[in-house]
């Protein structure tokens, strides 16, 4: 295999990796999976590659499988041979890049998972509404934190990076999965 294979779904987290593959000029094939929350078939098809049946799932040119968007981001930067998308080790921007990459995927990203379908996590309708409101308030706090740390014109100041792909994508994920399905 000389190309990557990205398993994804339009509007889901795989779009982060799809955008990076495109930006870095890395060749790949895209395999769309069904809605993994609604399709047993989709989960079964993806499970041999990713036991959690989540996207993004990326098969590398050598056949190895990667999951977790932050890890994939770092791998793609290394594999591309470019140092303009992810600050390389030793670059003064590297520590802040890593901090905010992990912040986005560990803190902000999950708020979309919870807010898209709160009743997946809380069955009682009243409790689901309260949960959804709490997640929304927390997401706003997280985005204010990101905004306060952002440079200009890009997150790291004069340097465009993968963080800008994450932020640009994630700030446009509303109104949620139902909208993307249309």
Model-inferred region functions:
Residues 101-182:
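GST-like fold's C-terminal all-alpha helical module
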Residues 1-130:
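GST-like domain detector, emphasizing the conserved glutathione-binding G-site
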């Amino acid at each position: 295999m000389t190309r990557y294979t990205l398993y994804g779904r339009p509007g889901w987290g795989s779009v982060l990796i799809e955008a990076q593959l495109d930006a870095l000029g890395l060749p790949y094939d895209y395999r769309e999976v069904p809605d993994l929350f609604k399709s047993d078939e989709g989960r079964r098809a993806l499970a041999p590659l990713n036991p959690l049946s989540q996207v993004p799932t990326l098969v590398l040119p050598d056949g190895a499988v990667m999951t977790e968007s932050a890890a994939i981001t770092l791998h793609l930067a290394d594999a591309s041979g470019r140092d303009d998308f992810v600050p390389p080790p030793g670059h003064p921007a590297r520590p802040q890049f890593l901090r905010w990459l992990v912040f986005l995927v560990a803190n902000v990203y999950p708020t979309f998972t919870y807010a898209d379908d709160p009743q997946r996590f809380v069955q009682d309708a009243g409790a689901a509404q309260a949960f959804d409101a709490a997640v929304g308030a927390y997401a706003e706090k997280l985005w204010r934190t990101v905004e306060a740390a952002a440079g200009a014109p890009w997150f790291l100041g004069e340097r465009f990076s993968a963080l800008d792909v994450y932020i640009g994508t994630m700030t446009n994920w509303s109104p949620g999965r139902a909208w993307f399905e249309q």
